[in-house]
Curated annotation (Swiss-Prot):
HAMAP family the UniProt entry points to: Transcrip_reg_TACO1 (MF_00693)
Stated name of the protein: Probable transcriptional regulatory protein R02753
Cell location: Cytoplasm
GO molecular function, one term: DNA binding
Length: 248
């Protein structure tokens, strides 16, 4: 399992999700507003908005918050957010990609660079690490959607590329350009997905020891704590033994 997925699971087990719920809702609302502003405010006519709302619902974001975020874009009083990607290296030479929605590029770049530096890493140029990742669609379902065989069959029929099933649920990947078509086909076979999004998937992973893993997780935690940062991806991998220690 890639490092950031492991990190998410550890934080979930430690209850971190509850501590950052307000910040998470704020970021989800920002994505909804940007999606509504860049297209039509109707999710049936705006694929990006539909996915943003779907993901917000999956995180139990209140309906009022979702509607308010859409109306903010329709009312024309929304800030002008810009999509920015930062790339760099964390401790141990691990590649890290940071996606942000910001109304001030200088502020965000300064914050992200400082976070990398404090962690013993370095912010690089755009393209410095993304060549070692693939941009893919990721669709997740809870285990209750069906057993591994059922989900695999549905994924093949839908035109997906891969399926991974573990104790957290089913993760289906597909081509970036095929997200809408594949997710729609899966919805017909398995019901509404838990999340549907575009992600950066590492082509290869870098194994790290416990010390490096702790440093990397702190880096990711600090990056995600920035209001402008929407997503963080990395290519490190932790052994089951180290994972058990970090999860304790």
């Amino acid at each position: 399992m890639a490092g950031h997925s492991q990190f998410k699971n550890i934080m979930h087990r430690k209850g971190r999700q509850d501590a950052v719920r307000s910040k998470m809702f704020s970021k989800l609302a920002r994505e909804i507003t940007v999606a509504a502003k860049t297209g039509l405010p109707d999710p049936t006519m705006n694929p990006r908005l539909r996915l943003a709302i779907q993901n917000a619902k999956a995180q139990s974001m209140p309906k009022d918050n979702i509607e308010r975020a859409v109306k903010k874009a329709a009312g024309g009083d929304a800030e002008n957010y810009e999509e920015v990607r930062y790339e760099g290296y964390g401790p141990g030479g691990v590649a890290v990609i940071v996606e942000a929605l910001t109304d001030n590029r200088n502020r965000t770049a300064s914050n992200v660079r400082s976070t990398f530096t404090k962690a013993g890493g370095a912010l690089g140029e755009t393209g410095s690490v993304s060549f070692s990742f693939d941009r893919v669609g990721e669709i997740t379902y809870k285990l209750s959607a069906g057993d591994a065989d059922k989900v695999m069959e549905a994924a093949i029929e839908a035109g997906a590329d891969d399926v991974e099933t573990d104790e957290e649920g089913h993760t289906i990947t597909c081509g970036f350009e095929d997200i809408g078509e594949v997710s729609k086909a899966l919805e017909g076979a398995l019901g509404e997905a838990e999340t549907v999004k575009a992600v950066w998937k590492p082509q290869n992973t870098v194994p790290v020891d416990e010390e490096k893993a702790q440093s990397l997780m702190k880096l990711i935690d600090n990056l995600e704590d920035d209001d402008d940062v929407q997503n963080v991806y990395s290519n490190f991998e932790v052994s089951d033994e180290v994972l058990a220690k970090l999860s304790a």
